[in-house]
């Protein structure tokens, strides 16, 4: 009975509803939820239900794609390209040179890549669970200016689908104004693969955000942050941040290298402070 019902919903009813976008999406999501409930009842045809669930999730994904226009789809592809390139860079363990090693174990490394230039990699441990760190960096990204003094503002310009956003970031000038204020327009995507979360991005063009007075428009990417539970203690999070950025302007490479590596070290410090203060605030509620 259930197989026939699924075929009816996904086949006959789909043809009938192909021009009713909201209902299609709602139906696909509802079907997924019902299948999840069935899987918990057991014992039963768990294997078959899992197969149908995967098909329904794929259907829901395809329906979402059909609601996006060509420009939005191009942004999604840019985000996925940034993710792929970033993971390829991080996957190559050869050629990394140490820039900074902190007493707490934080480490910044760098390497020079053809067609990209010098990239930096931060390796740090945050003593909070992955979901907490992910929530701060993704769900609360527009609040980053509250706790990271190197960032003036992060603003979401557009949300595309469930994993992709276009953002405008304003970076503060460095002490002594050695490097003036920069801003960036980026496409960002977030993915979760098992217990690993990946936040990737790269610069993009967005008609609604032309160059701003008082800021030099920089370019970044491919760049990403990889979050995973620390193997020795899953209540802590291992953070790996790949940074690839072009600050533009006439700046000596020595200054750029110093600024970018220090920016990563500072980020880890400020993130820890934010996570600690957030936990303390929750404990007082």
Curated annotation (Swiss-Prot):
The answer to whether UniProt assigns keyword Transport to this entry is yes
Under the heading InterPro entries, the entry gives: StAR, StAR-like, START-like_dom_sf, START_lipid-bd_dom
Q: What is its main location?
A: mitochondrion
Q: Where in the cell is it found?
A: Mitochondrion
Q: Which UniProt keywords apply?
A: Lipid transport, Lipid-binding, Mitochondrion, Steroidogenesis, Transport
Quote the pathway field.
Steroid metabolism; cholesterol metabolism
What job does the chain carry out?
Plays a key role in steroid hormone synthesis by enhancing the metabolism of cholesterol into pregnenolone. Mediates the transfer of cholesterol from the outer mitochondrial membrane to the inner mitochondrial membrane where it is cleaved to pregnenolone.
Q: How does it assemble?
A: May interact with TSPO.
Q: What is this protein called?
A: Steroidogenic acute regulatory protein
Gene (name only): star
